[in-house]
């Protein structure tokens, strides 16, 4: 019972902190940065996939489609068109894409340092320029592996659907855990795991709610639904970044309680 009380107390305090210190500002900044960097990041990944065979952009697209709300897939499809440019991109455009991508990771680190305050990890500049591509390659590898594992689970364990859903979610869990581990001083691994799974759970719930809403809007008016899709997509991204920052604050609150 003491552990549950500790968890609920940390959860309440991190939500209160998010309201007091207006984490929505940093979530909005991260949303804007991501929109600016998505196309360059995909161009860089497309070029990287030509050298590393296990990087499959099609699998990444499947993961995105599965975890993004329905009716926003058209936005993803437009963004993913940038992958065609990556196959013929010049060295200069690749360097520019890489520069923008690294700056986005720096922005994540800066936002997390604001949220976790005393538990921020001092990261050397070299980490951003060298560690980022390594993280990107690992994320692509985990994406490919989780995709094939989810297919196997669907084939041999048809009655246990949550196993395949969990397997397909591994890339996102891996990414959240990796970012927290890279920029936050973790004293107890249990706090990292609890926080990451809470972020995943509420992100999944958020996706479900947004999917229901977009389906409802499209039923009422296709024109209105089409016009509101992009706005909903931005809003959904913003809420997910807010969850990510609250999850980081949860780690500090849980370990200090």
UniProtKB/Swiss-Prot annotation:
Keyword Membrane annotated: yes
Keyword RNA-binding among UniProt keywords: no
Principal subcellular localisation of the protein: membrane
InterPro entries xref list: Virul_fac_BrkB (IPR017039)
Domain of life, source organism: Bacteria
Protein localization: Cell membrane
Transmembrane segments: 30-52, 88-105, 126-148, 161-183, 190-212, 222-244
Membrane topology note: Multi-pass membrane protein
One GO CC annotation: plasma membrane
Keywords (A to Z) from UniProt: Cell membrane, Membrane, Transmembrane, Transmembrane helix
Name of the featured protein: Uncharacterized protein aq_453
